[in-house]
Amino acid sequence: MRSIQLIFLLVFSISVFGSQAIGHAPIGVMADHMHKKGESMISLRASYMKMKGNSLDGNSISDGEILVIDNPHSNSPAKLSVVPIEMSMKMLMLGGMYAPTDDITLMFMTMFMDKSMNLNTFHAMMRNNIGSFNSSSSDLSDLSFSALVNINEQDKSRWHAEIGLKFSVGDKNEKGKVLTPMNTNMEMLLPYGMQLGDDSIALVVGFTNLYTLSDAHTFGNQIRFFRNISSEEWHYGDKTYFDSWYQYSVSRNFSISSRLRLNHQQDISGFD
């Protein structure tokens, strides 16, 4: 399934509490700001992603090319015969922050995920399309706990670091009804991409820089690394995110921002 590697967003931010809207990065950026001693915050974020097409080694690949690839896990059928069409993901994230001191902010995040995938099935021998089916999974996906630590703060620039752990708590053995290449319906283990977790623990390390251009203009950069330090038979690959954003303050409670994201994820490690 082809994923989006470069994302550009135009975001409108509204603050309904005491802080200024420009003081918070675009909604897709996590761990972007710190709080003063005794301050706390609760957040609820919703996002949606849809993907179409397939890729191999970073290049687009057609259904016909997939159907001549050897089945790596079985000789029946000998070739891959079930091909994804499109996939959607809905994510709901509940988070909280609390600052015990001016230089340390504690943060937690939990995510609920809903996945849906449409697939085509091709006959094991004749290789003709015999139909399509849908598989889905939804539940709590992961929990994370982090500490944000102030590194350097000046009049117009601030640096802080993030160190934390992310726990995958979603089911890694989700099953669903599958239309098989023999034109039968069977209850089977869903593919890796449809699983809600991998029973892994990941170390989270990040660095964020915020620069104030003027009272109405700010600029920010952030890099975050997710490295697996404990896993079972298989786990999703390590991830790296880089975000760069610009914000313009329309008023105290309203700002406009644009964000550029680059992301990289390594291949799945191991197999089930």
What residue spans do the PLM features occupy?
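Outer-membrane pore/translocation modules
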Residues: M111-N228
